Amino acid sequence: MLTNRVKKLSGLLFTHEHKDHIAGMDDIRAFNYVNQCKVDVYATKQVEDSLRREFPYVFEDLKYPGVPEINLHRIEDRPFAVGDLDFIPMPVMHYRLPVTAFRVGGFSYVTDANHIPEKTFELMHGSDVLVINALRHEKHVSHFNLEEALQIIDRVNPSKAFLTHISHQLGKCVDVDALLPPHVRCAYDGLEIFVD
């Protein structure tokens, strides 16, 4: 976030409790300091339980000075607002682990998944932009591979799609992009997507 000069954090939405998706919790403290306010954090009960185990000092009544300061909000099975944006939580599966995908306006975001239920496909219908994980070329037990991600992109039919959660096994993005349809590209650090 520092490299991309992010100055304000309106909210932080957790998709699931794996370490590579929650370890940045400590980075909130910089936004607490600069903006002089708590950061709104959104998580399911399952993710909240994990956050409390991994970061107990954030949730203590008597906090040590300088720990991340948050307002924790529970994600339920219904839309919720973060500032002026309305988010729709969408269930997906990461092998046996429930993960929350999100839709905001015409933008849908699906990471760490290998199964999308029909209910979620219905919620994704009409998305203009889709971000979806595509770990590698070969099948994987808990992530979509490139072929599966492209099939989902075809089904959702967004005008633009980005592949995320890519491993080195997929190859260099410049090489992968050359193989993709014109409306599909690899996501990259610093990518900005504007939603309404």
Each predicted region: which residue ranges?
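Active-site metal-binding motif and surrounding structural segment of the metallo-beta-lactamase
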Residues: 1-43, 127-128
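Core dinuclear metal-dependent hydrolase active-site scaffold
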Residues: 2-4, 69-122, 189-196
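Short, glycine/charged-enriched secondary-structure capping and boundary segments
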Residues: 3-6, 26-30, 55-57, 102-103, ...
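Active-site neighborhood of divalent metal-dependent phosphoester bond hydrolases
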Residues: 35-39, 47-72
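Conserved beta-strand segments of alpha/beta enzyme cores
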Residues: 40, 69-71, 86, 160, ...
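Binuclear metal-ion centers of metallo-dependent hydrolases, dominated by the metallo-beta-lactamase
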Residues: 117-196
